[in-house]
């Protein structure tokens, strides 16, 4: 849900933030098809654990943590120093973020068995971040990079429910599919939101509830916070998980050795 660097990562072909990984994946496929076509099935098969089974359904968890834990999270939020707040998403998302706070790292460790049971596969922690949305809060429609294959989205505090919308689980979109949405137009986000084939549904999490979803295979978005809510706010804790043992697959720099295609070494991991 959030790039860990100081910029929002997108490409011309994949115009949403956090799209860099998918662009690298299809670039790698094109290279393999050109220089060693016989290796393409092996490449696709090797990275298959990062995909999401289409039978998965978004899951709402009622109070996965007790009141004392929620109070402890709020205490951390209340006592954050201004220097701890990352500002690079303030304009685009109307939020401040804090990545991998020690308390949240421990909380994420505790959540591993919960998420593993919900998603039906063993997982390990990827990264986490606290998201402090203000009256300008918004989250444009996007897919996450597979570093966030699974997301545990905990509503820590809010002044009113803020809807979030999810598509069904989808195969990763290739350039041809995206051309159907974008086609050089600036309304590609609305075209995705209104696509009947994506079957968007809406959830309105309450304080203490959490949503488990597959951000890398489900389009998702939040419309701007309703200005009628006044001094609106929403504090969310995102904890991202990956299938256990797949960390190396996430780094394009490892793909050359993975399938014996030296030309893939030119691919660089996003910084």
List each language-model region with its residue ranges:
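Non-heme Fe(II)/2-oxoglutarate
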Residues: 5-119
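A short coil-to-beta-strand element that immediately follows conserved catalytic motifs
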Residues: 119-130
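Catalytic core of non-heme Fe(II) oxygenases with the double-stranded beta-helix
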Residues: 135-216, 246-253
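Short beta-strand His + acidic residue motifs that chelate non-heme Fe in jelly-roll/DSBH
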Residues: 139-142, 219-230
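A short hydrophobic beta-strand segment most commonly corresponding to one strand
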Residues: 151, 228-247
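Extended, acidic-biased charged interface segments
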Residues: 215-225, 238-242
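Glycine- and charge-enriched low-complexity intrinsically disordered segments
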Residues: 251-271
């Amino acid at each position: 849900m959030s790039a860990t660097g100081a910029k929002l990562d997108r490409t011309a072909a994949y115009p949403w933030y956090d799209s860099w990984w998918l662009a690298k994946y299809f670039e790698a496929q094109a290279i393999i098809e050109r220089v060693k076509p016989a290796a393409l099935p092996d490449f696709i098969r090797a990275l298959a654990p990062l995909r999401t089974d289409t039978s998965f359904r978004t899951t709402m968890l009622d109070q996965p943590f007790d009141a004392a834990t929620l109070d402890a999270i709020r205490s951390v939020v209340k006592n954050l120093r201004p220097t701890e707040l990352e500002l690079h998403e303030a304009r685009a998302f109307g939020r401040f973020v804090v990545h991998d706070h020690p308390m949240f790292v421990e909380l994420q460790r505790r959540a591993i068995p919960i998420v593993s049971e919900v998603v039906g596969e063993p997982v390990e922690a990827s990264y986490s971040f606290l998201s402090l949305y203000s009256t300008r809060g918004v989250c444009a429609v996007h897919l996450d990079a597979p570093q966030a294959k699974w997301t545990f989205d905990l509503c820590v505090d809010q002044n009113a429910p803020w809807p979030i919308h999810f598509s069904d689980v989808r195969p990763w979109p290739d350039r041809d599919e995206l051309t159907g949405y974008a086609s050089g137009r600036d309304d590609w986000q609305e075209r995705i939101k209104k696509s009947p084939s994506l079957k968007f549904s809406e959830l309105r999490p309450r304080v203490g509830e959490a949503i488990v979803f597959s951000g890398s295979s489900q389009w998702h978005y939040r419309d701007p916070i309703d200005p009628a809510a006044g001094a609106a706010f929403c504090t969310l804790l995102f904890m991202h998980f990956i299938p256990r043992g797949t960390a190396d697959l996430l780094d394009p720099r490892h793909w050359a050795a993975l399938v014996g295609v030296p030309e893939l070494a030119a691919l660089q991991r996003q910084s």
